[in-house]
Amino acid sequence: MCKMQLLSCIALSLVLVANSAPTTSSTKETQQQLEQLLLDLRLLLNGVNNYEDPKLSRMLTFKFYTPKKATELTHLQCLAEELKPLEEVLYLAQSKNFHLTDIKELMSNINVTLLKLKGSETRFKCEYDDETATITEFLNKWITFCQSIFSTLT
């Protein structure tokens, strides 16, 4: 009986390692990484909301894909897939309040944090919502996602 449980435990561990699941990350580390991601997403949202009306209205014409249902850290792959288009839109609409260097730094921070949170696994296939989102809706949705995951960890 014990052999069977041990073998099951080993098999499960191998599956987790094979799928690059973040096995060594403690809950506290995950919380800290989520806090960092939340901070960076909020900074982006604040930067977007501080644009003058013409630039903001131009940015709102770009549409982003959001997942149908994001409930787990693996769903961060969907955010990772939309980071490049997000970065390009932000570059197009830079302002004196939100410089290229700020955008690059925030996007780099987000990329690093996402990699830590979701692991290096990219086989997860995102199921996107049929409707696209504006840049502010997109950022708000991911902020809400992070807050939701964070609340389950506390």
Swiss-Prot record:
Annotated coiled-coil segments of the chain: none
Signal peptide location: 1-20
Glycosylation sites: 23
Superkingdom, taxonomy of origin: Eukaryota
GO process terms (BP): adaptive immune response
Pfam assignment, any one: IL2
UniProt keyword Signal, yes or no: yes
InterPro entries reported for this sequence: 4_helix_cytokine-like_core (IPR009079), IL-2 (IPR000779), IL-2_CS (IPR030477)
Gene Ontology cellular component annotations, sorted alphabetically: extracellular space
Record's keyword terms, sorted: Adaptive immunity, Cytokine, Disulfide bond, Glycoprotein, Growth factor, Immunity, Secreted, Signal
Disulfide bond positions: 78-126
GO molecular function: cytokine activity; growth factor activity; interleukin-2 receptor binding
Xref: Gene3D superfamilies: 1.20.1250.10
Subcellular location: Secreted
Family the UniProt entry places it in: Belongs to the IL-2 family.
Main function: Cytokine produced by activated CD4-positive helper T-cells and to a lesser extend activated CD8-positive T-cells and natural killer (NK) cells that plays pivotal roles in the immune response and tolerance. Binds to a receptor complex composed of either the high-affinity trimeric IL-2R (IL2RA/CD25, IL2RB/CD122 and IL2RG/CD132) or the low-affinity dimeric IL-2R (IL2RB and IL2RG). Interaction with the receptor leads to oligomerization and conformation changes in the IL-2R subunits resulting in downstream signaling starting with phosphorylation of JAK1 and JAK3.
Protein name: Interleukin-2
Gene label: IL2
